[in-house]
Regions:
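Transmembrane alpha-helical segments that form core, pore/gating elements
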Residues: 24, 82-84, 88, 120-179, ...
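C-terminal-most transmembrane helix of multi-pass membrane proteins
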Residues: 17, 114-115, 191-193, 227-286
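Hydrophobic transmembrane alpha-helices of multi-pass small-molecule transport proteins
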Residues: 24, 45, 85, 94-116, ...
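Juxtamembrane C-cap of transmembrane helices in multi-pass membrane transport proteins
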Residues: 1-6, 19, 56-66, 74, ...
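Juxtamembrane helix-entry segments on the extracytoplasmic side of multipass membrane proteins
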Residues: 6-14, 36-42, 114-142, 176-196, ...
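Alpha-helical transmembrane segments of compact multi-pass small-molecule transporters, enriched
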Residues: 19-23, 74-88, 103, 166-171, ...
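Transmembrane alpha-helices of multi-pass small-molecule transport proteins
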Residues: 4-54, 81, 139-146, 161-180, ...
Length: 286
């Protein structure tokens, strides 16, 4: 709602990265201080580029060009990218269970999105907007696959404060002129509260929870929970009386939860390595 009352997408991205940087720096003062070599601080710049700058900017600009339903459908590509990149970068196997789970989740999410589209949101799609939205998903999938070792090495507050700091340094030189044009006096107080909600809950707490998962879960598992977002959106809309739950959406919910379960239960590289070592041990002692 904030984006309809004086704060557009680029402004919101700018506030999110700056607000996130400030909150994570404040939080870091209450956690154990960690020594970070210069090379890792530079790596965190890369994490900020892929996990925040490209992801947020590409999606925000893409959303302004294409339709909401198209942009939502594009987000279903992220677990597919994460699965492929995890195979190429982290050597995580693409098992049948994992592949079927990702496709089931993707199908369920698409059903939710398409059955939730209304004539009031019938903006025409745009190929460049769609490509930007896909680029945003590829960017975040790269972040999940490339920077998992970095996330596991340091505390989530250390990683996030540097990621958001770098993102602020990359984004604000290009957006400060746009932000300064906001008619601050005309923006309703409710809009500032909504922006604050996005910064604190959607960004600060959101990245804390995401990184806790990233530390312990495989990139494909982290990304597949992306399919739950449209289901949560529809459920909340039904609860507040803005939508009606449809039969096809119930089927979609089953597909999403089944897909997530299959991906979570699929074997990781460590599982397969342990199994191979166990077989080798049994053969040696047979």
């Amino acid at each position: 709602d904030a984006m309809l009352h004086g704060i557009d997408g680029i402004d919101l991205v700018s506030f999110r990265v700056l607000g996130g940087a400030l909150l994570f720096w404040i939080a870091s003062f209450f956690t154990k201080r960690e020594h970070i070599p210069t090379k890792d601080i530079i790596k965190m710049a890369g994490a900020g580029i892929f996990g925040l700058v490209c992801n947020q900017c590409c999606y925000t600009i893409g959303l302004s060009l294409t339709s909401p339903s198209n942009s939502s459908i594009m987000t279903t590509s992220m677990p597919i990218f994460a699965m492929i990149l995890s195979f190429l970068i982290l050597k995580e196997p693409i098992t049948w269970k994992k592949a079927i789970g990702v496709l089931m989740g993707c199908s369920g999410a698409c059903i939710i999105i398409l059955t939730s589209a209304t004539a009031g949101n019938a903006k025409v799609g745009n190929i460049w907007g769609d490509l930007l939205c896909i680029s945003a998903q590829l960017s975040f999938a790269l972040y999940l696959a490339l920077f998992k070792p970095l996330v596991q090495k340091y505390s989530l507050f250390t990683v996030n404060k540097w990621m958001f700091t770098w993102a602020t340094l990359f984004i604000w030189p290009f957006t400060i002129g746009h932000v300064s044009d906001i008619p601050f006096a005309q923006v309703p107080m409710s809009t500032w509260w909504e922006t604050g909600y996005v910064i604190f809950f959607g960004t600060f707490l959101g990245y804390i929870c995401m990184m806790i998962g990233q530390k312990t879960l495989r990139p494909t598992v982290v990304s597949v929970y992306n399919y739950v977002q449209p289901l949560v959106s529809v459920t909340v809309s039904v609860i507040v009386g803005l939508a009606v739950f449809k039969g096809m959406q119930a089927i979609a919910a089953i597909l999403i939860f089944s897909g997530v379960w299959l991906v979570v239960k699929s074997k990781s590289k460590n599982d397969i390595d342990k199994h191979d070592h166990s077989l080798a041990y049994e053969k040696r002692h047979a």
